[in-house]
Amino acid sequence: MTAVEPATKKKRISKKNKSAWRKTDIQDVEQFLEDQRQEERVGTFADKQDEDLFVVDSSLPKTKATVLSVKQKRKLNAKKPMRSYQALENTSKVQDPIAKRNHVRQKKNGRNIELEVCNPTKPRHRQANSDRAQYYVKLEQRLADKKNKKLDVEKDIWQEVDFRDEIPGLKDEKGWISRELALHTAGNIGKKVVKTHASLHHKTTKAKKFELPHPGMSYNPAPEDHQALIDQVVEREEGIIKKEQHLKRVTTSMFSKVTPEERDRRRLNEMSQGMDEEEGSELDEDVQTNGKKKEDDDEKPYHTINAPVENKKKSKQARRNELKQKELARQTELKRKLKQQTADLIRIKSIRHELDDEEEDLNDLKKRRKQRAEKAKFEPKRLGRHKFEEPDLDVNLPEDIAGNLRNVKTESSLLKDRFHTLQRNNMLPTTKLVSRKKSKVKRFERNSHKEPGVSYNDLKERRRAAAAAAKATANIKI
């Protein structure tokens, strides 16, 4: 069978004369006859088997190229050998003439950890291997439990459960125990309903919630307690005064105070130092040099500013001497190092003592830093801009002690003390009193209110005197 070609519209040609018959298209007849002859030679399609006519396509179907992400590309590149090692690869096609090589392995210095693990010889190595094996067993068990963990699908997540039903005594029918009280009680008996972070239960300060005042602050204190309080206040004030004196010594006292006129005069003298002497000498030199300048210019030979450069090469003898000097310096340095080593061997005991002292100092420093860090845990934290400072102690002098509550002198405020306690316990940030800025308003008196011949300041003084007189009169009546 032949493939059927699609029919095409033939072009009509005039065949009126016999000579025009040669224009007739006989291509289809010739093609049919050629197909007949071909079938007679090789046979028709019906006579052949399917295996001769068709071929089974066993090739894999072509898939579209998948676009890899950056992470997948990074993983594929990690499996490839590094480019820095490509220079070490053998790219030659010539075979190695030496089929087998005897590699000489040098003995490594120090411990061979791999050998100690594989062939333990000491008890601590065996103990380490057993601990390592137990750790891996526990790790595999933990990973297996995590993999085989089943989710609790039987639990209804939308079901509302009251925690008071599980804890006896927290739910009553009359409603005396509220939900907030039950929640607080459950947390205190070890059955917390709301899980909180562990850091909330760590103590951050050693300060007490309510600290009793010093016994010397009593309205009728014992003489010893009152004296101890005074000593404590005096010691604190001495520290403050000492600090102020130090700051004054290193700042104000280091510089002398002068008036602006004196300062300008000193600066002028300093900047004009040596100018008067130079002016007189310069005039004399100019007169002398001007006459000799022309004569010197004629006598001096011409020369360039930069000296000519000569490329002088070292001789063999100079190079040999230079090498000898370098070798001599090297030998001298070796002798010095050998001498230093010999001296160190002689004083090895003193070096050992120095190392011990240095190690002891280092341990003391570590201990102090650890103590300082432990102490800083419980100090008042800086929760805001300002650092907490202990308030001043209230103290009465011996003549101010009343002895009874009726004549006691008020020194402090309970609200202030409580406020400082909250700041000390890291509950409130430390603040400072900020006064509101009072705007400076310039006042003018109207012309209609002015008295002739009296200024504004005089009127102000009169009003102030009148107010003081009225106040004095009111006090006398009382």
Swiss-Prot record:
- Composition bias, Basic residues: 100-110
Alphabetized InterPro entries for the sequence: Nop53/GLTSCR2
Chief localization class?
A: nucleus
Q: Where is the composition biased (Basic and acidic residues)?
A: 259-269, 442-452
Q: Where do Acidic residues bias regions lie?
A: 275-287
GO molecular function terms listed in the Swiss-Prot or TrEMBL record: 5S rRNA binding
Report one GO cellular component. nucleolus
What ranges does the record give for the region Disordered, renumbered to this chain?
90-110, 253-323, 440-459
**So what does this one do?**
May play a role in ribosome biogenesis, being required for integration of the 5S RNP into the ribosomal large subunit.
Protein name according to UniProt:
Ribosome biogenesis protein NOP53
Taxonomic classification, please?
Answer: Eukaryota, Metazoa, Ecdysozoa, Arthropoda, Hexapoda
